[in-house]
């Protein structure tokens, strides 16, 4: 399925976004989003899609990942200064909806040890799941830093009740090539999720947190 966004248009938009952020330096790292408008789609009737794709470059380096770990994982997390909670700490939340909601808000994503992942519904109730942040599995065979980077590089497309959505695909300190590759990957993946592919795409824009939104499509 070929992309309807030409390489030239892609780079024009990427450069416009990066240039705008250089001209007006903010005192925080601006995130770059892909904003998507859909058409010929009825959120009531049509199946709401959701899917995740791993990008080549981490879009949000400051993303906070918390490890819900067994003893070994918690020790490892502490040595890496990664936020971490053990089963005891989770029990203390006592399934309190407010506290679980607060936890879900505090972190962008969670990873959990095998022994803990099965206990999460029992320990925390459905709160993390409702927030769309049910933990990914962290095994002892893989490197924690690699796994965290993988989580940070993964973006999620989720169709809700409205016909527009936006996802973080990068930040303004990326090179044009890095940002362009992430945007290209994101668009192709999104289009593959749509029932009628490009016929469901009304518009695509790119936008940094504070910048103008050049039109990709």
From Swiss-Prot:
One of its GO terms (biological process) is translation. The keyword Ribosomal protein applies. CDD domains: Ribosomal_L1 (cd00403). Coiled coil: none annotated. It comes from the Eukaryota. InterPro entries: eL8/uL1-like, Ribosomal_uL1, Ribosomal_uL1-like, Ribosomal_uL1/biogenesis, Ribosomal_uL1_3-a/b-sand. Keywords: Ribonucleoprotein, Ribosomal protein. PROSITE patterns: RIBOSOMAL_L1 (PS01199). One of its GO terms (molecular function) is RNA binding. The keyword S-adenosyl-L-methionine does not apply. Disulfide bonds: none annotated. One of its GO terms (cellular component) is large ribosomal subunit. It holds the Pfam family Ribosomal_L1. Belongs to the universal ribosomal protein uL1 family. This is Large ribosomal subunit protein uL1. It comes from Spodoptera frugiperda. The gene is RpL10A.
């Amino acid at each position: 399925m070929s992309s309807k966004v030409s390489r030239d248009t892609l780079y024009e938009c990427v450069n416009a976004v990066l240039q705008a952020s250089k001209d007006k330096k903010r005192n925080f790292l601006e995130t770059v989003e892909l904003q998507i408008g859909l058409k010929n789609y009825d959120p009531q009737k049509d199946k709401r899609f959701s899917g995740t794709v791993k990008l080549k470059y981490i879009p949000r380096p400051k993303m906070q990942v918390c490890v819900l770990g067994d003893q070994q994982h918690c020790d490892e997390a502490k040595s890496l200064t990664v936020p971490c909670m053990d089963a005891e700490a989770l029990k203390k939340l006592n399934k309190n909806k407010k506290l679980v909601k607060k936890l879900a808000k505090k972190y962008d994503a969670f990873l959990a040890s095998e022994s803990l992942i099965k206990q999460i519904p029992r320990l925390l109730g459905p709160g993390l799941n409702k927030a769309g942040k049910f933990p990914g599995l962290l095994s002892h065979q893989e490197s924690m830093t690699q796994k965290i980077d993988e989580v940070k590089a993964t973006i999620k497309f989720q169709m809700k009740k409205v016909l527009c959505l936006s996802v973080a695909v990068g930040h303004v300190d990326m090179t044009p090539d890095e940002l362009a590759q992430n945007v290209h990957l994101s668009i192709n993946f999104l289009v593959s999720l749509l029932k009628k592919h490009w016929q469901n795409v009304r518009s695509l824009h790119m936008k940094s947190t504070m910048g103008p939104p050049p039109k990709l499509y």
